[in-house]
Amino acid sequence: ANGKNGIKSGATTDEEGEASLTIRELTLSINASVNDAINAEQYLAVESGTLNLATADVALHCDLIMDIGAEGTDGPTIAIAEACEGIEAAALSIRSGDISIVCTDDCLNAANSDLANYDFAINISGGTIVAYTTAGDGFDSNGSLTISGGNVTVWSGGNADNQPLDADGTIAITGGTVLAAGSSAGMGMNLSTTQAYVIFGSAGISGMGNMGGQPGSFGGMQPPQNGGQPKSDSKVSGNFQPSDDFRPGDMTSNNI
């Protein structure tokens, strides 16, 4: 059933529209052995509740538009323990929530190979996101990537081609707290920022703000030798710590 997806909204009988799915005040635990844990065609909204997801493909997938949380709310709790890709839509907005992701490809992905000339976008304006991928990009948009609020901690895989933050268009950091780590520090990315951030990896370090250094420096601080990757026996959670000598929770807007 449902192509072995956990939950799927398919096409409606109305030729002018496709089905949508809204999740509100539910507690769901889904293990999808083949395809997506939750799949919607036109619109997927996760407003509140608790989702515990594991899947062989994408944990949360929508062909077009996905909204997670809402401004002024605590939003949902989403724990993705295992997936190929974590959260995928052509246009993805995260406004609130507590989200943890462990996957083997992109943690957040704005893409759809069936759409041409689409304004692909990832927009993060609130919530707490802790994401780790073993072999992909942390956040990957085929268009723009904008972080204007929230607390973001992301690790990308060991492959030098992968970046913690990756976009075909502009990456804009205008608010929130951002810590991104991986083998590539994203030196070639099209980054526009108006506030403090930290991006580091074995290929280099970049950053700005009042860290005791100039843009492009790290204020004398050194990243962990393992590239910021969590220990193999660690579990992702809202206070996830990657190593004994490095604690992203300590890096708040007050001491960046």
Residue ranges and their predicted role:
Residues A1-I256:
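A composition-driven surface/loop motif
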